[in-house]
Regions:
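A short, Lys/Arg-rich alpha-helix, primarily the initiator
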Residues: 1-22
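Pre-recognition alpha-helix immediately N-terminal to the DNA-recognition helix
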Residues: 11-12, 43, 60
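Residues in the recognition helix of alpha-helical DNA-binding motifs
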Residues: 16, 30, 47
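DNA-recognition alpha helix
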Residues: 25-36
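DNA major-groove recognition helix of helix-turn-helix/homeodomain DNA-binding modules
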Residues: 52-72
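Short amphipathic recognition helices of helix-turn-helix/homeodomain-type DNA-binding modules
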Residues: 71-79
């Protein structure tokens, strides 16, 4: 079974959502509202697991969730 793994940054994002009582769908809507870019669950999942590099989206997520200087690295996955 091929199990996808979140990057450290992706795990930080998921944890920040849980702490705020917000869903990934809420985050997708906020990203779209702030950037004007369409966001869906599949694309955000690829970003959180390091399969996609989207600097504008990462910046928006960091701002929305108030994540401080947490780097987004494709190779930094959680087992």
């Amino acid at each position: 079974m091929n199990e996808s793994k979140f990057t450290n940054w992706g795990l930080t994002v998921k944890t920040a959502l849980l702490r705020r009582g917000k869903t990934q769908s809420w985050l997708e809507e906020e990203i779209t509202r702030r950037t004007g870019l369409y966001m869906d669950a599949g694309y955000i999942y690829k970003i959180l697991t390091g399969r996609r590099n989207a600097p504008k989206i990462v910046t928006a997520i960091n701002e929305i969730l108030e994540i401080k200087t947490q780097a987004h690295h494709k190779t930094n996955r959680i087992s």
